[in-house]
Amino acid sequence: MKLTDNVLRSFRVAKVFRENSDKINCFDFSPTGETVISSSDDDSIVLYDCQEGKPKRTLYSKKYGVDLIRYTHAANTVVYSSNKIDDTIRYLSLHDNKYIRYFPGHSKRVVSLSMSPVDDTFISGSLDKTIRLWDLRSPNCQGLMHLQGKPVCSFDPEGLIFAAGINSEMVKLYDLRSFDKGPFATFKMQYDRTCEWTALKFSNDGKLILLSTNGGFLRLVDAFKGAVMHTFGGYNNSKAVTLEASFTPDSQFIMIGSEDGKIHVWNCESGMKVAVLDGKHTGPITCLQFNPKFMTFASACSNMAFWLPTIDD
């Protein structure tokens, strides 16, 4: 089944889970698409089975809190950032609920975390104005970059380069093997004082970069030329909430939730809005991602919703 405008318009909430007492701050699908794991401001980690459509288990990170949870390539392991006490990144085995390793180094809150799509490397960006490069096998930082502002960062789909959005005004591209030589490309954007960038994502085909903000718009950028292709708006975000925006796996569409529980979908190429879906969420939709392998997506406020299409094209 192929994603089309009509298929997207047909999506409806199939299941809602109320496992959390506070907002879900992040979730991540496993590479197989079979499970999704969430982190929440209530200090819990919840693992869901996407095929059976039910929560499998709940773990807690009471002391340090949990945010920016990400699957690694090994089965049943995740990395995540702390949101209280310290700014250490933690590597957890879900199998026995034990920490495998800690990654200390950042002196302020980690705001961006990206796992390499190909190996055990990951990068983290922090309010301490640094990006650090790590290897899951070592607690020591493998590389450090000092920047001129708050960073958001992500690997490209090949895992050969990473992009850093700095101070909400420029995107720099780095070659992973020689990042200490500085960026090989820098794209300056129009600075907007009304909001800041909250995330940077590549499309799966590597051609597009999506810049999310805590304002009322998103920017879609050509990953090779740095030109802004589209600015997407018309959704509600009056309280400057961090709303997650995502590409669909085919790189054809972009979606974002809003503070009023609706999901807005645009066509990347034309820039046209193709759907507004009502998730009936009780709060702002802070997290939204399409499943990498199956025709389903998930959205979250303090509740988690699984969506399915109601037509088969």
Curated annotation (Swiss-Prot):
Gene Ontology CC entries for this record: chromosome; PTW/PP1 phosphatase complex; Set1C/COMPASS complex
Signal peptide (from-to): none
Gene3D superfamilies: YVTN repeat-like/Quinoprotein amine dehydrogenase
WD repeat start-end pairs: 19-58, 105-144, 146-184, 192-231, 236-276, 280-313
Intracellular or extracellular location(s): Nucleus; Chromosome; Cytoplasm
Keyword Acyltransferase applies: no
InterPro entries: G-protein_beta_WD-40_rep, Swd2/WDR82, WD40/YVTN_repeat-like_dom_sf, WD40_repeat_dom_sf, WD40_rpt
Gene Ontology MF, one: chromatin binding
One BP term from GO: RNA polymerase II promoter clearance
Keywords carried by this UniProt record: Chromosome, Cytoplasm, Nucleus, Repeat, Transcription, Transcription regulation, Transcription termination, WD repeat
Assembly notes: Component of the SET1/COMPASS complex. Component of the PNUTS-PP1 phosphatase complex.
Described purpose of this protein according to its UniProt entry: Regulatory component of the SET1/COMPASS complex implicated in the tethering of this complex to transcriptional start sites of active genes. Facilitates histone H3 'Lys-4' methylation (H3K4me) via recruitment of the SETD1A or SETD1B to the 'Ser-5' phosphorylated C-terminal domain (CTD) of RNA polymerase II large subunit (POLR2A). Component of the PNUTS-PP1 protein phosphatase complex, a protein phosphatase 1 (PP1) complex that promotes RNA polymerase II transcription pause-release, allowing transcription elongation.
UniProt similarity note: Belongs to the WD repeat SWD2 family.
Record protein name field: WD repeat-containing protein 82-B
Species per Swiss-Prot/TrEMBL record: Xenopus laevis
Protein encoded by which gene: wdr82-b
